[in-house]
């Protein structure tokens, strides 16, 4: 039997430039991706470069709390 918490957890990645540039009302919305991470290999917050359809470019998406 497995003890403790699950090793793999589901996380949400949110575009950091959309959150900061909320003044720009042309593209209303914040890009979010759902993925999984291994808690043992990456204990810190995850940041990945993903495509944001609201910014029309690749930006840094950071892990947020649920």
UniProtKB/Swiss-Prot annotation:
GO terms for molecular function: structural constituent of ribosome. One of its GO terms (cellular component) is chloroplast. PANTHER family: 50S RIBOSOMAL PROTEIN L33, CHLOROPLASTIC, LARGE RIBOSOMAL SUBUNIT PROTEIN BL33C. This is Large ribosomal subunit protein bL33c. Belongs to the bacterial ribosomal protein bL33 family. The keyword Plastid applies. The gene is rpl33. HAMAP family: Ribosomal_bL33. It holds the Pfam family Ribosomal_L33. The keyword Zinc-finger does not apply. Gene3D superfamilies: Ribosomal protein L33. Keywords: Chloroplast, Plastid, Ribonucleoprotein, Ribosomal protein. SUPFAM superfamilies: Zn-binding ribosomal proteins (SSF57829). It is found in: Plastid, Chloroplast. One of its GO terms (biological process) is translation.
């Amino acid at each position: 039997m497995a003890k403790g918490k699950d090793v793999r957890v589901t996380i949400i990645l949110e575009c950091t430039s959309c959150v900061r540039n909320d003044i720009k009302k042309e593209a209303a919305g914040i890009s979010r991706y759902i993925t999984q991470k291994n808690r043992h290999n990456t204990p810190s917050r995850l940041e990945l470069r993903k495509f944001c359809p609201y910014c029309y470019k690749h930006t840094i998406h950071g892990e947020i709390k649920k």
